[in-house]
Regions:
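The feature captures the beta-strand-to-loop junction immediately N-terminal to the Walker
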Residues: 49-50
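Helix-to-loop junction immediately C-terminal to a conserved catalytic motif
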Residues: 64
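P-loop NTP-binding/switch modules centered on Walker-like glycine-rich loops
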Residues: 187, 191-259
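Conserved ABC ATPase "signature" region
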Residues: 131-148, 201, 257
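Conserved ABC transporter NBD signature motif
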Residues: 72-80, 92
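Conserved catalytic motifs of ABC-family nucleotide-binding domains
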Residues: 174
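Conserved ABC ATPase signature
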Residues: 153-157, 161
Length: 259
């Protein structure tokens, strides 16, 4: 591969602004993402760290097409995907997935797990109807859950189990790139390590690329290839994990490391 094709995702001068009103006739915006440039290499775990309100989740949602960018360019596997989700080809949607922070709000409480996992398979025409149950069973086993979970509902499960289902749903389409938006922050400490270890095993087994969003710097020390720090909508520092923890240079990064 050339250096250009090594990058599975490239973000160039991305801006996502939200209009919040007018003051003296002038439009006022929240600059949630304000000129971010970032490249993620195939097969790596890129850590994106920042406090609440730094813009990291907005960046993720813009990359996924859930928010339209105000300005800038997003390229995935060499294809410009800056337009919103509705204008993206199905094969791009299939290849890019996201796991949200709160599985309780991201899973339909009125559906059982079989229905939840079948939906992406149906949307993308991945398997025939008669093979659906077998495929759902395989997906459940991928995240270390038995087929007995198939007819449970999200409300009957614990937070860790629900997040495993969220991960299973994201992996159902066999993506190459997954955004993990604080996937363990809403879980008990006892289950966090299990989820992280499972994600790393899946990443290695399936050669996945992760954009791992978190506020937990210590977690990134152990799992990330590189780390980027987001502050007030901008990336203020980015380096290899070793370099980042050994020789941080930005005052905000130093503050995070000392807190």
């Amino acid at each position: 591969m050339s250096k250009e094709t090594d990058n599975i995702l490239t973000i160039e001068n991305l801006k996502t602004y939200f209009q919040v009103g007018k003051v003296k006739g002038k439009t006022v915006h929240v600059r949630a993402v304000d000129g971010v440039s970032l490249s993620i290499k195939k097969g790596e775990v890129m850590g994106l760290v920042g406090e609440s309100g730094s813009g990291k989740s907005t960046l993720a949602y813009t990359v996924m097409g859930m928010y339209p960018p105000t300005e800038g360019k997003i390229t995935f596997k060499g294809e410009d995907i800056s337009a919103g989700s509705s204008r993206r080809p199905l094969d791009v949607k299939k290849d890019m997935q996201i796991v949200f922070q709160d599985p309780g709000s991201s899973l339909n409480p009125h559906q059982n797990i079989k229905q939840i996992l079948e939906l992406p398979l149906k949307v993308h025409g991945i398997v025939k109807k008669e093979e659906m149950e077998k495929r759902v069973t395989q997906i459940l086993r991928t995240v270390e859950l038995s087929p007995a979970y198939m007819y449970k509902t999200p409300g009957s499960m614990g937070g860790g189990e629900r997040q495993m289902i969220s991960i299973a749903r994201a992996l159902a389409t066999d993506p190459s790139f997954v955004i993990l938006d604080e996937p363990t922050s809403a879980l008990d400490v006892s289950i966090q390590a299990k989820i992280i270890n499972m994600l790393l095993r899946l990443q290695e087994k399936n050669n996945l690329t992760y954009l791992f969003i978190t506020h937990d710097l210590s977690l990134m020390r152990n799992i990330a290839t590189r780390v980027a720090i987001m502050y007030l909508g901008k990336i203020c520092e980015m380096a290899s994990t070793h370099e980042f923890f050994e020789t941080p240079y930005h005052p905000y990064t130093k503050m995070l490391l000392s807190s």
